[in-house]
Structure formats: C-alpha cells, structure tokens
C-alpha cells in the first residue's frame, strides 16, 4: 500500500543510492545522468515510479540563457488500483515499465526553473480496468507535462500531469490521468 511513510522511505533509499553510487552509475551504466522517484495518483489509483535518465546534451533553440534539450527516461512503476472492475474496495496491484523521450526547456547551466513534456510507451502487467476507466490493452502511450527546479547541489524537484492512453488502438479507451511529485538526483 502506498503511504506517506513508504514514499519517504523510498525517497531516502533513492537519495542514499544516488549519493553513494553516483560515480559508479556514471561509469558503469553507460553514463546515466540521474535517478528519480515519483509519487502521486489519480481517480482511485496511487502510483510510485522509479526511473533512470540519460541526457541528450543538446542546445536547440538557444536564447536568453535557455535552450531546448532533453533526456531518455526508463522507468518502472507500482500502481495500486482501489476500485478494480468497478467494485468498491476491490484492489489490484499492477507493474508498469516504460521508456519516454522527454523534451526540456532549461537554463544553459541546467540549474533553476524548467518546463518539460514527453510522450513515451509503457506496458502494464495486466489490462487496466479500474473504476469506469478501461484501457483495453496492456500497451499504453504515456505523455506528460511538468515543471520543476534544479538546485545547485543537483537535486531536482518537480510536478507532472501524466496521461496514459492507448491512442485509440482498441476501445474502450478511457485514459488515466495522474498528478505526480518528482524528486531526482543528478550525477
């Protein structure tokens, strides 16, 4: 079950791992640039997601100390659905894995305020049928928009609005919307 205590413990674990393994991750895992944890939810669902990022290190459309860049985000998530098959208190746990290219408008030094958006692909451990939201396929597109702030010590705190949908591949396709808080540490 997702609780405040579990979220705090997960954030602490990611922070400890990131701080102790930063140079190892950068060298041994093909130059990963950061790790993140996200937590939040939507209508009768709570989500915790862990991810790793690889920056593109691009400077497109540079002006006024900002530019467009981005990163690859590989993630795995735990979803706790609380109204499975539209039955009150019928719970189901799901695993979700995904990959998303994310475009970020950021400062040239990669610090301070940013805005980002991404559209990726995800696979659910089973077809989502929580409340009146049915997605009909295990494959889903995952798009988001978000804002955040990167501190000088490489910690990044942000918020996102995430939408999952199969893009009309199969009906019904009710879509699932989530509000998420994200904490990341850059190596």
Task: Give each language-model segment a name.
Residues 35-41, 72-78, 117-121, 159-163:
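Transmembrane beta-barrel strands of outer-membrane/channel proteins
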